[in-house]
Regions:
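Short, surface-exposed secondary-structure boundary micro-motifs
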Residues: 52, 57-58
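Acidic, glycine-rich catalytic/binding loops that coordinate metals and/or anionic ligands
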Residues: 42-48, 71-141
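Zn2+-dependent peptidoglycan hydrolase active-site motif and core
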Residues: 1-43, 62-67, 71-72
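Generic serine detector
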Residues: 17, 29, 36-37, 57, ...
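Conserved beta-strand/loop element in small beta-rich adapter and peptidoglycan-binding domains
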Residues: 1-3, 47-48, 52
Length: 141
């Protein structure tokens, strides 16, 4: 997603520090949630944008199916998708919904709405990698 060092891994979680001080409570950090322990990136690994962090799973909390969550923090505070700086994932810009789990991604003419059911129809696959992002295709408004 962005260049930075992996500073923590745990039950379904990977935390990446983006400012290089090794402390994910200062500056920018990215949290990846529901990451499988199988082939998960190790603490101390420096990632570049596009590097694989691990595999989607149900680890790290209650889940009805394999999926991933991404979040960002600045100085230890959660930053919303639409808060100031856009959150862009492989060309898809994230937007807040009216409540939790109701956001959407937008990339040109494509609009992808969050779907709590998450199934085959709720994914984006980057052809150049094994990484998958889950979505439900919906017509653009």
């Amino acid at each position: 997603m962005a260049p930075g060092e992996v500073v923590y891994t745990g039950n379904g979680v990977v935390v990446q520090d983006l400012d290089g001080d090794g402390n994910w409570q200062t500056g920018w950090s990215i949290l990846y949630m529901h990451v499988s322990s199988w082939e998960r990136v190790a603490v101390g690994t420096y990632l570049e944008a596009g590097d694989q962090v691990g595999h989607a799973s149900c680890e790290g909390g209650v889940s009805t199916g394999t999926h991933l969550h991404f979040a960002r923090k600045y100085n230890g505070e959660w930053v919303l998708a639409d808060d100031g700086l856009p959150f862009v994932l492989s060309g898809y810009r994230a937007h807040n919904g009216e409540s939790y789990y109701e956001g959407y991604l937008e990339n040109g003419e494509k609009t992808v709405t969050a779907n709590i059911a998450g199934n085959y129809w709720t994914r984006i696959i980057r052809p150049e990698s094994r990484a998958e992002f889950f979505y439900t295709p919906t017509p653009r408004k």
